[in-house]
Amino acid sequence: MIHFNRLFSGRFRVRLLLMILLVSICSNGNIFAGGQDRAGTAAAPELRIPVGGQYLALNGSAVAYASGLEAIYWNPAGVYLNNSNASAIFSFREYIADMNMSYVAVSGNFGDFGTLAVSFRNLNVGDINVTTIQQPDGTGEIISPTYFVLGFTYSRVLSDRISIGANFNFINESWGGVSANGFSVDAGVQYRDLFTPGLSLGVVVKNLGGAMKYDGSALFIQADDPSSGRGNTFYQVAAASFELPSEFSLGLSYTKALNEENLLSFSGAFVNNNFAYDDYKFGLEYAYNNILFLRGGYLFSPQSSDDRPNIFQNYTLGLGLNLREFSDIDVSLDYAFVPVEFFNNNHTFSIRVNF
């Protein structure tokens, strides 16, 4: 007789999970292909815009120990780590060129079953005046593009050290009479107290899914094909399809308690990007009495000529404040500063509430 409890022991489940991740990576053969030579050609670039102020201040290096609702973006394996019955977060990021990114998510803890979460990301690019060759100053028409990602997350504990998580995302882009829909999956693992207490390992693959393709009435044009004999008629322009910006991240972190009031957390991550330079990220967080948090991060890309992969500068800064000690509500405020070249600097604000 098969003993299912033994069959699905902790070690077996870890091996099975790692096997699934490897199969997922291998089945998406292009995940490690290309790089910077394909920058700007991916579908759904909004998938790569970080949200939340807590871990953005660490430059995204906290793959191994990200927890709570901000972990949805960085590593869904950490979503369960919030020791509360329910949680909510709202985040707002001032992006480049008058664009901004809003993020809201809620989660519920269902005991041994795990944690379920729903998230919504919206990239607001503002209104765009329509221009043509004949009317370069504008036709008077205004289009308002919409870009959003609706996500469903599942996270649970496999043992006292191991957690897993996955995001299932619906992607929608719509503007000027055309639209495109897509689906993507993120999957991650976190392993705590690896070899020694405080040392954690995190692995995550993100944005796995099929290509996206635009469709809609704006792709129809009027033309006259003399060979058809049909006169002036409508023809549909064949839109190209574009791959999602897949990436793979491997991270380590180490947390050290200096005393009862002071805590230091070091984090680092390697990120292999399908449509950009590979990144090395490092972060440092200082926590005082679990009330005040000071954060900083640094990123460099050896493949880039100046160690910087894009218009964003190498470093990030931020701070956090936990108001639980001063009120009856478990509320945390976070801020992240991202310096930018050519555009205004990015400011990200977020508020987290636990119930």
Language-model region placement:
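Charged, low-complexity surface segments at secondary-structure and domain boundaries
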Residues: 3, 19-21, 43-44
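A compositional/structural signature marking long, glycine- and acidic/polar-rich segments
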Residues: 11-15, 290
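Bacterial N-terminal signal peptides
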Residues: 17-28
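N-terminal secretory signal peptides that target proteins for export/translocation
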Residues: 1-12
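Subset of outer-membrane beta-barrel
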Residues: 30-355
